[in-house]
A protein has these predicted regions:
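Structured, contiguous alpha/beta core segments that scaffold functional sites
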Residues: 1-133
Length: 133
């Protein structure tokens, strides 16, 4: 067919239906954090920075939206990406931003397999960003 994964998703309603259904169902699953207390015991953690971050990854989206968007990219492209950076304004001290896989322009590697940096472009602003792997 000669179409990219993104073009297939845009033009095939059945593919969109399956991807949307699966991504939404996965996003409904709770993500829980645990603290290991001993070799065979763990206690659910609801107050750590990680637990807080996963519930509220950034000021623009919920944890459900983060997982749904990430799963959609994973199901379409086979991978997804988050930009995790310190943020003193957030409750956890961190933010997670989902970067749409379609924005990636270049993945530089050491040996063809191991990435050392990613370059992506926001199509709305044409801003190019390169981040280390």
């Amino acid at each position: 067919m000669g179409l990219t994964p993104g073009e297939l998703y845009e033009t095939q309603p059945a593919l969109r239906a399956v991807v949307s259904f699966l991504a939404d169902e996965v996003a409904h699953l709770p993500i829980r954090c645990y603290v290991r207390e001993s070799e065979n015991d763990r206690k659910r953690d609801t107050s750590s920075d990680l637990s807080t971050l996963l519930r509220c990854p950034n000021s623009d989206m919920t944890g459900h939206e983060l997982i749904r968007n990430s799963m959609s990219d994973y199901l379409i492209y086979g991978w997804c990406a988050w930009l995790v950076i310190p943020d003193l304004q957030s409750k956890s001290g961190w933010t997670i931003t989902h970067i749409p896989t379609s924005w990636f322009e270049n993945v530089a590697t050491f040996d063809g397999l191991t990435p050392y940096e990613y370059t992506f472009v926001n199509p709305k602003t044409d801003k190019r960003v390169t981040v280390p792997a």
